[in-house]
Amino acid sequence: MTISYDEEFSSLMLRWRGSIWKAVLKDLIGFYIAYYIVLAFQWYLLDEKGKEYFTGWIMWCEIGAQYIPLSFLLGFFVSLIVARWWEQFNCISWPDKMMIMVSACLPGNENMVVRQTIARWSSLQAAIAWSGVSVKTLKRFPTERHMVASKLMTEEEYDLYMNTDAPHGKWFIPILWIVNLIKKQKQKGIIDSIQMDMLLKQVYSYRDGFAMLFVYDWIKIPLVYTQVVAIATYGYFFICLIGRQPKLDQRSMEKEITILFPIFTTFQMLFYLGWLKVGQYLMNPFGEDDDDFELNYVLDRNTAIAHMMASELSDQLPSIGAPMVPAVPHTRASFKIQDVIPKSHLAGFKLSEAEMKLIKPEDLEEHERLMEETKVTNRQRLGTLVRALEKKSRTNATINEDDEE
């Protein structure tokens, strides 16, 4: 079940379900047990020479642990898993748009049975398809007889479904029943070609979500990458069993502070193992972990919504004519926290009166004349400046010749 939370930060850290504490507790306890076994071996069973030799192993493991690119591996792995997790959620099919189109194209009490049948088959489609990817839905509908008992499938539909030979799966059969029912309404003249096309587009869109979930269930994250990340993480902390031990030889105890509890290693385990557990839990979001998707709830919700749209909401229309007010009132609570009205970054930009004056054709001619006069004046000034520079250059050259003589 997806865990919701909106408490303050201090209360959030004390949550258990779906928390980091629950995710890493067993691994943390196992690490502490192994850590203190190694510490007891070093403390009680090694003499001074053995402790000096063991200190060399500690230093060697400390250096070796730095060569494992754990942050890079976990960062890329979890980013891939989270993106895939959200994409799978977006593949969950919702019948709302399809049932809205069904209600629009098949109105009236005379089409009530057709609308309700399409609604029921949409829920049957979800129950069959999700039973193939979700453990929770499979436990709810372990066999097709359970769908008959749940009134999602009739005995006739059960016989048709079971007698269909489909070696590559038959989860799509209810969708075909919906398509055939729409075709029948077209043949009867109840809907036209345009309405049929709009209905079929919604049915195809509804079907695509189930197909993509089967694709995600089929194509997993490559096993070799999952193994690399798991081996790197657990291998890192296996090295830390020795590399983070206190140095108990006489020389080291005189120079360094000896701390018997692995404080910083504990923080690393919370971060790195918590990171790894996120990827492991989200890799299959249709299992039974705390943060897995509740497809049983989605099925209940979709069934109720589809039934409402097919029956009591299909032709419901309140009376019209009530005037619309230009402003929606606030409560005292919402009035205190009104949002700042967004403004364009050019809202305060203003031009002067001269800049806002419109340019007329005669103004353009006058402007071009003035520009031409300005160019002529500039050329004259430039020519005068060049001649002055040449004259000064000749004068300087003459002075230099006189000095040489």
Swiss-Prot record:
Cellular localization per UniProt: Membrane
Pfam families, sorted: Bestrophin (PF01062)
Molecular function via GO: chloride channel activity
TM segment ranges: 28-48, 63-83, 223-243, 256-276
Annotated coiled-coil segments of the chain: none
Gene Ontology CC, one term: membrane
Membrane topology of the entry: Multi-pass membrane protein
Keyword Plastid among UniProt keywords: no
Organism superkingdom: Eukaryota
Keywords: Membrane, Transmembrane, Transmembrane helix
Keyword Phosphoprotein recorded: no
Family: Belongs to the anion channel-forming bestrophin (TC 1.A.46) family. Calcium-sensitive chloride channel subfamily.
Protein's recorded name: Bestrophin homolog 14
Gene from which the chain derives: best-14
